[in-house]
Amino acid sequence: MPYLSILTTVDLSRIPGFGDTTVLELISEIGTDMSKWKNYKHFAAWLNLAPNTKISGGKILSSKRMKKKNKAGQILKQAASTISNSKDSLGDYYRKMRSKLGGKGAVTATAHKLARIIYTMLLNKTEFNSEIIEGNQKKYTEDKILRLEKQIAKLKAA
């Protein structure tokens, strides 16, 4: 919708999983000024999408997801759960995270990735570019193939 582009100067509805209503709800919660946060890590922590890691003496004591609710974080989690069935690179990322972290962890990890994308788009006033994410996914796939080929060679040698 044209009013969304005027409001945010970038079209957030081009991100997979985001519709006009989702973008309006999100913008009403976070606004368009990203200078409130130092970087995307602070933004993700404010959304309760970053782990609450307790460290003492350089040793990690615990790392849990925050229990507090944040409306904007909930919106991003809802968008992340709709991405689960998509055939694009964000859907691939969700499925990769689901195999590692389980369902809830995958939703949180994908929502965290969406938060980084939104933060960067609003801060730099750039449009969504799926080619960057697809390039990262392609590199991950190539690296995985190389690792598997090395394992096959190692097993053949043994």
Placement of each model-derived feature along the sequence:
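A detector of single, family-specific signature residues
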Residues: M1-A158
